[in-house]
């Protein structure tokens, strides 16, 4: 789904991670929930958040982040809602 102020995406990962220099720096805020699997998100300030199915996180616009890892044993399914104010 996509409108001028909101975009919803389902993302499927299986053992992927962002490249070492691959920081996301988005114009939109992002709310993401893990529906299945596991993942670790890393932030430019050095903080890491481990996520399991049912966990969610809000990422403000321009908060540089990356996917450190996703589960290699099980498919990881994300539901991401990107939005602008």
List the model feature ranges, each with a label:
Residues 1-23, 81:
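A short glycine-rich, His/Asp/Glu-containing loop-to-beta-strand
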Residues 62-85:
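Ligand-binding loop in jelly-roll beta-barrel domains
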